[in-house]
Amino acid sequence: MGNLFGRKKQSRVTEQDKAILQLKQQRDKLRQYQKRIAQQLERERALARQLLRDGRKERAKLLLKKKRYQEQLLDRTENQISSLEAMVQSIEFTQIEMKVMEGLQFGNECLNKMHQVMSIEEVERILDETQEAVEYQRQIDELLAGSFTQEDEDAILEELSAITQEQIELPEVPSEPLPEKIPENVPVKARPRQAELVAAS
């Protein structure tokens, strides 16, 4: 049990993943380099101003040449970063294409297996059997319809009408009055009087 739950999952990092990680690390290093150079250029520009104020024009000019060279380095660095990002995007898109192709291949294999189970011949056989069953039932219906005379048809319709009439007829309401029930709590002496009233009515 311990080995079962303690087993480490196998790494699913591919060579493409490693390449993407390495390219992104190089890109990040170049961006850090850009940031340092940009900060240095600001300092050198401020220093060149100070040198001009101090009357040291040649020194300021030399510093500006150095600054210009570093700006060119920044442009080259930006181009390198763009190339790295394009490479990363290309690899990532290729990975997506590979997954799509794997999905298409899996789907194609499933379709092939289904076609093996249900071939065209099998489908045609089932359709033929279905058509035969329908035709057989039609022939039975025709035989049954032709075996009855007009007298039989009339008798069947008459019986059907009688059954229908039985279902819709309701029982009649009784015309005789219901016998009057003498309440149990009426005194015994009063009961003959009630019987006389009923007879008189």
Swiss-Prot record:
GO annotation, cellular component aspect: amphisome membrane; autophagosome membrane; cytosol; endosome membrane; ESCRT III complex; extracellular exosome; kinetochore; kinetochore microtubule
Secretion signal span: none
GO BP terms: autophagosome maturation; autophagy; ESCRT III complex assembly; late endosome to lysosome transport; late endosome to vacuole transport via multivesicular body sorting pathway; macroautophagy; membrane fission; midbody abscission
Predominant location category: membrane
Residues spanned by motif Type-2 MIT-interacting motif: 168-179
Cell compartment(s), UniProt: Endomembrane system; Endosome membrane; Late endosome membrane; Membrane
PTM remark: ISGylated in a CHMP5-dependent manner. Isgylation weakens its interaction with VPS4A.
Tissue and organ expression note: Ubiquitously expressed.
Positions carrying Phosphoserine: S119
Resulting phenotype, R49E: Does not affect the subcellular location
Residue stretches in coiled coil: 10-145
InterPro entries xrefs: Snf7_fam (IPR005024)
Pfam hit, one: Snf7
Interaction with VPS4A: annotated segments: 170-181
Residues carrying lipid (N-myristoyl glycine): G2
Modification Phosphothreonine occurs at: T130
GO MF, one example: protein-containing complex binding
Keywords: Coiled coil, Endosome, Lipoprotein, Membrane, Myristate, Phosphoprotein, Protein transport, Transport, Ubl conjugation
Result of changing V173D: Abolishes interaction with VPS4A
Entry similarity comment: Belongs to the SNF7 family.
Purpose: Probable core component of the endosomal sorting required for transport complex III (ESCRT-III) which is involved in multivesicular bodies (MVBs) formation and sorting of endosomal cargo proteins into MVBs. MVBs contain intraluminal vesicles (ILVs) that are generated by invagination and scission from the limiting membrane of the endosome and mostly are delivered to lysosomes enabling degradation of membrane proteins, such as stimulated growth factor receptors, lysosomal enzymes and lipids. The MVB pathway appears to require the sequential function of ESCRT-O, -I,-II and -III complexes.
Free-text comment about domains: The acidic C-terminus and the basic N-termminus are thought to render the protein in a closed, soluble and inactive conformation through an autoinhibitory intramolecular interaction. The open and active conformation, which enables membrane binding and oligomerization, is achieved by interaction with other cellular binding partners, probably including other ESCRT components.
Self-association and partners: Probable core component of the endosomal sorting required for transport complex III (ESCRT-III). ESCRT-III components are thought to multimerize to form a flat lattice on the perimeter membrane of the endosome. Several assembly forms of ESCRT-III may exist that interact and act sequentially. Interacts with VPS4A; the interaction is direct. Interacts with VPS4B; the interaction is direct. Interacts with CHMP4A, CHMP4B and CHMP4C. Interacts with SNF8, VPS25 and VPS36.
Listed name of the protein: Charged multivesicular body protein 6
